């Protein structure tokens, strides 16, 4: 029986002053262990999602933990039958998750971590303001009962949203969550700096909650968007029902795929009327290449990760 692919989401806020020099040996460690996916490294830490065999993931994690600064790096695992990534990359960044606010440093100041088993009790408190720190397209697929949707299109918009809608003097308790924990951890650091006193965030993010909390006890509704070819996951981190439009990157449901405006690899109901003719023709050609490669049982370099050029 073919062994499932292990998907590992990992991050750690830690000062990596030599992150530029770290890029090449990290990339080599990924290659040596047969790892696909992308890792981001910056002065503030490391972040990314990778995939590979059981032995490959164990080998990469052992390599990372051989660095004393990363010895306690945590990662969350799930499984899939097909390789969710096609490339192996290590990217140098200013931030491992981009908030765009100078001085925010989770290495120095961060909110209170809440274990998944304790999360339901916290968010059931009527005095707690529950905020989803993810982007609008992620929230539309699933979120926690009673959570506020900031309707942001990028994490950079989060600080302005907080300033415009909430007051530390009024909103005494704030709880936040995101996919794997990294965005809400950084958001908690930002909010503490803005004067909010009681700031909580879900340790391990939604993924850890879906893994550990039984579905019958869950306050989660819907599916959770993930940044790989699975698109979404459900409780127990099994693959969800959504696909993704390669034109606009919007998650698409079975209903979307039944629409007359859906064409695999070309358009969906969310973008069919906004694509230029040039982009549409390019997408049609690309899709033909993918289908031809599939018919020949050959991998195609764009595969499900293909993204059409921006219309901007």
Curated annotation (Swiss-Prot):
Keywords: Oxidoreductase, tRNA processing. GO terms for biological process: tRNA modification. Residues 124-218 form the Rhodanese domain. InterPro entries: Rhodanese-like_dom, Rhodanese-like_dom_sf, TrhO, TRHO_N. Residues 293-312 are annotated as: Disordered. It comes from the Bacteria. Transmembrane segments: none annotated. CDD domains: RHOD_YceA (cd01518). SUPFAM superfamilies: Rhodanese/Cell cycle control phosphatase. GO terms for molecular function: oxidoreductase activity, acting on paired donors, with incorporation or reduction of molecular oxygen. The active site is at residue 178. Its EC number is 1.14.-.-. Disulfide bonds: none annotated. The keyword tRNA processing applies. It catalyses: uridine(34) in tRNA + AH2 + O2 = 5-hydroxyuridine(34) in tRNA + A + H2O. Belongs to the TrhO family. Catalyzes oxygen-dependent 5-hydroxyuridine (ho5U) modification at position 34 in tRNAs. PANTHER family: RHODANESE-LIKE DOMAIN-CONTAINING PROTEIN 7-RELATED, THIOSULFATE SULFURTRANSFERASE/RHODANESE-LIKE DOMAIN-CONTAINING PROTEIN 2. This is tRNA uridine(34) hydroxylase. It comes from Pseudomonas syringae pv. syringae (strain B728a).
């Amino acid at each position: 029986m073919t062994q499932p692919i292990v998907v590992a989401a990992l991050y750690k806020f830690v000062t990596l002053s030599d992150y530029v020099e770290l890029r090449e040996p990290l990339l080599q460690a990924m290659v040596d262990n047969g790892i696909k996916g992308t890792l981001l490294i910056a002065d503030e830490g490391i972040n990314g999602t990778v995939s590979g065999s059981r032995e490959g993931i164990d080998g990469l994690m052992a390599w990372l933990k051989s660095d004393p600064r990363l010895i306690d790096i945590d990662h969350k695992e799930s499984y899939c039958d097909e390789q969710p990534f096609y490339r192996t990359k290590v990217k140098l960044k200013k931030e491992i998750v981009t908030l765009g606010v100078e001085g925010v440093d989770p290495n120095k100041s961060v909110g209170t971590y809440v274990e998944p088993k304790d999360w339901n009790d916290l968010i059931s408190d009527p005095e707690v303001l529950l905020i989803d720190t993810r982007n609008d397209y992620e929230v539309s697929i699933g979120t926690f009962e009673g959570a506020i949707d900031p309707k942001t299109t990028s994490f950079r918009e989060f600080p302005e949203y907080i300033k415009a809608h909430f007051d530390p003097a009024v909103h005494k308790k704030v709880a936040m969550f995101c996919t794997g924990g990294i965005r809400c951890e950084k958001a908690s650091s930002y909010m503490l700096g803005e004067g909010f006193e009681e700031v909580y965030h879900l340790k391990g993010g939604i993924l850890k909650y879906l893994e550990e909390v039984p579905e019958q006890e869950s306050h989660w509704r819907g599916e959770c968007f993930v940044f790989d070819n699975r698109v979404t996951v459900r409780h127990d981190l099994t693959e969800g029902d959504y696909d993704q439009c390669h034109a606009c990157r919007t998650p698409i449901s079975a209903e979307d795929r039944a629409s007359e405006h859906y064409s695999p690899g070309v358009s969906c109901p969310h973008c069919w009327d906004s694509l230029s003719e040039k982009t549409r023709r390019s997408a049609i050609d690309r899709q033909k290449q993918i289908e031809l490669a599939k018919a020949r049982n050959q991998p195609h370099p764009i595969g499900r990760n293909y993204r059409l050029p921006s219309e901007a």
